[in-house]
Amino acid sequence: MNGDQKLDVHNQEKQNFIQHFSQIVKVLTEDELGHPEKGDAITRIKEVLEYNTVGGKYNRGLTVVQTFQELVEPRKQDAESLQRALTVGWCVELLQAFFLVLDDIMDSSYTRRGQICWYQKPGIGLDAINDALLLEAAIYRLLKFYCREQPYYLNLLELFLQSSYQTEIGQTLDLITAPQGQVDLGRYTEKRYKSIVKYKTAFYSFYLPIAAAMYMAGIDGEKEHANALKILLEMGEFFQIQDDYLDLFGDPSVTGKVGTDIQDNKCSWLVVQCLLRATPQQRQILEENYGQKDPEKVARVKALYEELDLRSVFFKYEEDSYNRLKSLIEQCSAPLPPSIFLELANKIYKRRK
């Protein structure tokens, strides 16, 4: 298959995935929209779903479907099993939406996926916290509706619950490493950074979609899952470091969001790299300007990053990490096809959004 054909297949898969969303909304809302007691709340759920779940890249959700199709022999891929794979893909997207709505509140973000954050919309505010919980609840309603009779139902429930917990642990590490109003650069070590990334991003963004497809394909052995986890945690770190780079150096018209890591006092890959390279004078500049909302102070930190040429440091890291990832896939992917992991790595390598 040449590049254009691959693109056509990918675009078709993406369209099929997006089209399934209307079915998801229908299952979650249709029966109760006219309910005499709950009707108004169900209308709100529909609005929350339609604003917060669509508009992303759908990489996580599509990974479930693509991996399922690669692991399950074609004769077993009937319409019903593909519906279930699409639904579980949307459950991953719902989990992502749940985290993002809350994350945007905690980070005081303004835009997400090219539109104003949900909590920033007039009349929403902190009610968005409850809306996020509705998104999380939708996951388990869908799993029950579509997968309850399947042998992998319990494994999927545990996987989603575990992924939520790991992500919340990661968010906790992130928040306590950089408490609001307290800048303590001594906390920003490479070790702490890797822990935050492992728990906050890698589990739900990389392991969850692949592991869900594995369970749906009947692959539930500990060794197979441990090997997949090893590769996918490494990939998750690679992805988050790209994200940290794009937060500052990305183009908001491409990324769909304006980065706030410097003013939010985040333990970002860039600040960790800056601290590893800074002279005492440069560290002083960082101490005086990091974690503050003043645009001039943010600009000083950015200038310091430019002075230390952190762009080049990132490009070298991206190259080295990609090569390391490829050799890890070679060693650990069996008995799964290496292509599952390689396609995912290629999708994020040199991404700019």
Swiss-Prot record:
Task: Show the Pfam families listed in the entry.
Answer: polyprenyl_synt
Binding of Mg(2+) 2: at which residues? 103, 107
Choose one Gene Ontology CC annotation of this protein and give it: cytoplasm
Positions of Mg(2+) 1 binding: 103, 107
Q: Which reaction does it catalyse?
A: isopentenyl diphosphate + dimethylallyl diphosphate = (2E)-geranyl diphosphate + diphosphate; isopentenyl diphosphate + (2E)-geranyl diphosphate = (2E,6E)-farnesyl diphosphate + diphosphate
Q: In which tissues is it expressed?
A: Testis, liver, kidney, brain and adrenal gland.
Recorded hits in InterPro entries, A to Z, give: FPS1-like, Isoprenoid_synthase_dom_sf, Polyprenyl_synt, Polyprenyl_synt_CS
The keyword Nucleotidyltransferase belongs to this UniProt entry's keyword annotation: no
Give the pathway: Isoprenoid biosynthesis; farnesyl diphosphate biosynthesis; farnesyl diphosphate from geranyl diphosphate and isopentenyl diphosphate: step 1/1; Isoprenoid biosynthesis; geranyl diphosphate biosynthesis; geranyl diphosphate from dimethylallyl diphosphate and isopentenyl diphosphate: step 1/1
Q: Which GO terms describe its molecular function?
A: (2E,6E)-farnesyl diphosphate synthase activity; dimethylallyltranstransferase activity; metal ion binding
UniProt-annotated site: Important for determining product chain length, residues:
98-99
Q: Which CDD domains match?
A: Trans_IPPS_HT (cd00685)
Which controlled-vocabulary keywords does the entry list? Acetylation, Cholesterol biosynthesis, Cholesterol metabolism, Cytoplasm, Hydroxylation, Isoprene biosynthesis, Lipid biosynthesis, Lipid metabolism, Magnesium, Metal-binding, Steroid biosynthesis, Steroid metabolism, Sterol biosynthesis, Sterol metabolism, Transferase
- Gene Ontology biological-process entries: cellular response to fatty acid; cholesterol biosynthetic process; farnesyl diphosphate biosynthetic process; geranyl diphosphate biosynthetic process; male gonad development; positive regulation of cell growth involved in cardiac muscle cell development; positive regulation of cholesterol biosynthetic process; response to cholesterol
* Coiled-coil stretches noted in the UniProt entry, renumbered to this chain: none
Task: Report whether Ribonucleoprotein shows up as a keyword of the record.
Answer: no
SUPFAM superfamilies recorded: Terpenoid synthases
Q: Which PANTHER family does the record cross-reference, listed alphabetically?
A: FARNESYL PYROPHOSPHATE SYNTHASE, FARNESYL-PYROPHOSPHATE SYNTHETASE
Provide the family line.
Answer: Belongs to the FPP/GGPP synthase family.
Q: What does this protein do?
A: Key enzyme in isoprenoid biosynthesis which catalyzes the formation of farnesyl diphosphate (FPP), a precursor for several classes of essential metabolites including sterols, dolichols, carotenoids, and ubiquinones. FPP also serves as substrate for protein farnesylation and geranylgeranylation. Catalyzes the sequential condensation of isopentenyl pyrophosphate with the allylic pyrophosphates, dimethylallyl pyrophosphate, and then with the resultant geranylpyrophosphate to the ultimate product farnesyl pyrophosphate.
Q: How does it assemble?
A: Homodimer. Interacts with RSAD2.
Protein name, entry field: Farnesyl pyrophosphate synthase
Name its species: Rattus norvegicus (Rat)
Task: Report the gene name.
Answer: Fdps
